[in-house]
Amino acid sequence: MIHQQHMRNIAQWLQENGITRATVAPDWMSIPCGFMACDAQRVICRIDECRGWSAGLALAPVMFRAQLNEQDLPLSLTVVGIAPEKLSAWAGADAERLTVTALPAITTYGEPEGNLLTGPWQPRVSYRKQWARWRVMILPILLILVALAVERGVTLWSVSEQVAQSRTQAEEQFLTLFPEQKRIVNLRSQVTMALKKYRPQADDTRLLAELSAIASTLKSASLSDIEMRGFTFDQKRQILHLQLRAANFASFDKLRSVLATDYVVQQDALQKEGDAVSGGVTLRRK
């Protein structure tokens, strides 16, 4: 129904004459000669190759009467989207010289009835209007989603940092308790093997808690010069014996005072080894 070649000729002529805006071409030029199309807002009619008109529904009857008054010969129209009876009512006394052929209304999804534009001239969705309509709702939703994503990222980063710090502290305590271990590959398996070596038949959980507390004590500033050289645990008597090495005798006195809060402390004989002092301490829970 659309004269595509006519549209191409018009578009080429506009381009050759430096007219680049498509809006200068009247909308009625999109339909064939002798056609009239109507939708919910307007009526367009093409009289011949160079003449036509476009009007709203209120002004359309006046334009149609003017067309009939200008043309003395019988008028033949092919209409889309408008009832022939309505045209006859518009024509009034001149309805007898009017021949109307009605075609089914053409409806494109999302477009009004009576739209005959196809191909490169087919109406497009105005995304700018859609954005102006929905941005009031979309922007706050996007801000909320971004805030939730940032909060989630910060939470995951914080948890990862806490896990890394806990692992570092556990490794430092392990190396303090077992100085013969020079490198940590698998902390869990190395702790298990070390506990089996020093105490084959005991409650691992309880002993590990005891050793962790002692390691934290040895890492304090006042006792940082004391080094753990080994330990043994008597499961039957619930006695923990530590082999230690310190810078001087005073360090052992400080250690004994600190441990006396939770343990019954018995100190073995101390021996001078060059610039350091070595000896043992036996602990029993109060």
Curated annotation (Swiss-Prot):
Gene3D superfamilies: General secretion pathway protein M, EpsM (3.30.1360.100). The keyword tRNA-binding does not apply. GO terms for cellular component: Gram-negative-bacterium-type cell wall; plasma membrane; type II protein secretion system complex. The chain crosses the membrane at residues 136-156. Induction: Expressed at low levels in exponential phase in rich medium (at protein level). Keywords: Cell inner membrane, Cell membrane, Membrane, Protein transport, Transmembrane, Transmembrane helix, Transport. The keyword Transmembrane helix applies. It is found in: Cell inner membrane. InterPro entries: GspL_pp_dom, T2SS_protein-GspL. Pfam families: GspL_C. Coiled coil: none annotated. One of its GO terms (biological process) is protein secretion by the type II secretion system. It comes from the Bacteria. In many other E.coli strains this gene is part of a type II secretion system, but in MG1655 the locus is missing a number of genes. Involved in a type II secretion system (T2SS, formerly general secretion pathway, GSP) for the export of folded proteins across the outer membrane. Belongs to the GSP L family. NCBIfam families: typeII_sec_gspL. This is Putative type II secretion system L-type protein YghE.
